[in-house]
């Protein structure tokens, strides 16, 4: 107690001014303090630890520490055959497992140089866009609850449940689907799936617009996110950002449009970038808006696929799948537009084994999180929650 009093006395100077008046000068300088957020913290969206250096309430540096969810995916991929890797891929970005399977199968099929049945291509895009909407609903709902808005969280998970039911009906699983296989799919759509999906599209379109209004017209939500975590477009490109993070900085880049795969070239959709009317381009609010706009675009793509998809007529989605996959010697990089950005797989084959020599995953979450120092510098400690939520990380993909 005595030491505290001495410290206070040293920081306060009383200067006599005459006539009984004095001037009190206070030394308000502060020392740098290190603050840990996580790995068990409600704002980190998983087992992430941020080591924050702070000057008072202002963050001067934030260093992310990773690896708490490391599960040796890339090493496992070297001892499992090509089809057996699909369930491991599911467990990377478990909120968008269909999209992860799609990216991996694109890479292997590129190495095999096989042609995919046209109906399967439409099936893949439908389930991937459904999963994209479900993933964005989790991102928006948890972002809202991070900032204190509970009602949008309930709305998001209410509507997400419809998608989970559709994907479970198609694949037999609610999350880790193992549905998109190399050369095809595990099952054809069940009877009535097309009609039920069309019903969902009609149901959810007004709900998606309602959700946009619920948050973007909320004064508190806007004040917590607008101008927070700014990222200029050139810096975003230099960091290797992709997906909603890059588009939130005003860069119009989407693999489905600019490096198209599957049947995306046949679909009419626009790349969502903020216009600057509701947000400062490059801030946390812009990244949120991109995800909100993308859900509406995904509905349009699903609708187009339902109209164009060939009829089943006894179709077997496993017809083009080889019993034993042994690609020719070579290497390949395949990528797809995941809800969080570009997910890519670099695969090396020796031409002899049914297992890859090397399978390297390019995680969009890992790349996006690498810019945490840039995003957090000069921000207040409470605003770190808004910044982390705007990145929309899944630690299963970051740590692998």
From Swiss-Prot:
Keyword NAD found: yes
EC number: 7.1.1.-
InterPro entries referenced in this protein's UniProt entry, alphabetically: NADH_Q_OxRdtase_suD, NDH1_su_D/H, NiFe-Hase_large
Entry superkingdom: Bacteria
Main location (coarse class): membrane
Reaction it catalyzes: a quinone + NADH + 5 H(+)(in) = a quinol + NAD(+) + 4 H(+)(out)
A GO-annotated cellular component: plasma membrane
Membrane topology, from the record: Peripheral membrane protein
Similarity annotation: Belongs to the complex I 49 kDa subunit family.
Oligomeric form and interacting partners: NDH-1 is composed of 14 different subunits. Subunits NuoB, C, D, E, F, and G constitute the peripheral sector of the complex.
Record's function text: NDH-1 shuttles electrons from NADH, via FMN and iron-sulfur (Fe-S) centers, to quinones in the respiratory chain. The immediate electron acceptor for the enzyme in this species is believed to be menaquinone. Couples the redox reaction to proton translocation (for every two electrons transferred, four hydrogen ions are translocated across the cytoplasmic membrane), and thus conserves the redox energy in a proton gradient.
Name the UniProt record assigns to this protein: NADH-quinone oxidoreductase subunit D
Gene that this polypeptide is encoded by: nuoD
């Amino acid at each position: 107690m005595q030491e505290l009093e001495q410290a206070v006395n040293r920081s306060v100077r009383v200067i006599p001014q005459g006539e009984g008046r004095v001037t009190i000068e206070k030394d308000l300088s502060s020392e740098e303090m290190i603050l840990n957020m996580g790995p068990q913290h409600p704002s980190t969206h998983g087992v992430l630890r941020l080591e924050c250096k702070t000057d008072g309430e202002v963050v001067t540096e934030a260093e992310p520490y990773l690896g708490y969810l490391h599960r040796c995916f890339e090493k496992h991929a070297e001892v499992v055959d090509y089809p057996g890797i699909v369930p491991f891929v599911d467990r990377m970005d478990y909120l968008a497992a269909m999209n992860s399977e799609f990216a991996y199968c694109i890479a292997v099929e590129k190495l095999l140089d096989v042609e995919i049945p046209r109906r399967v291509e439409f099936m893949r895009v439908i389930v991937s866009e459904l999963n994209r909407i479900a993933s964005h609903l989790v991102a928006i709902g948890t972002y809202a609850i991070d900032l204190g808005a509970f009602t949008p969280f309930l709305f998001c998970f209410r509507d997400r449940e419809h998608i989970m039911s559709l994907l479970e009906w198609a694949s037999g699983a609610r999350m880790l689907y193992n549905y998109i296989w190399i050369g095809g799919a595990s099952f054809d759509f069940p009877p009535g799936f097309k009609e039920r999906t069309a019903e969902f599209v009609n149901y959810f379109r007004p709900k998606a617009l309602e959700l946009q209004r619920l948050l973007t017209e909320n004064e508190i939500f806007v004040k917590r996110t607008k101008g927070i975590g700014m990222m200029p477009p050139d810096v975003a490109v230099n960091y290797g950002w992709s997906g909603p993070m890059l588009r939130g900085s005003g860069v119009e880049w989407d693999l489905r449009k600019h490096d198209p795969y599957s049947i995306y070239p046949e679909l009419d959709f626009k790349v969502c970038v903020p216009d600057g009317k509701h947000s400062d381009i490059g801030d946390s609010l812009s990244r949120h808006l991109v995800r909100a706009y993308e859900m509406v675009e995904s509905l349009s793509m699903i609708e187009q696929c339902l109209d164009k998809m060939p009829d089943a007529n006894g179709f077997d989605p496993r017809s083009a799948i080889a019993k034993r996959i042994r690609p020719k010697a070579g290497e390949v990089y395949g990528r797809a537009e995941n809800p969080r950005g570009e997910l890519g797989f670099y695969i090396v084959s020796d031409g002899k084994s049914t297992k890859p020599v090397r399978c390297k995953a390019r995680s969009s979450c890992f790349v996006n999180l690498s810019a945490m120092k840039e995003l957090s510098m000069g921000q207040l400690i409470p605003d770190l929650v808004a910044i982390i939520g705007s990145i929309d990380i899944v630690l299963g993909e970051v740590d692998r």
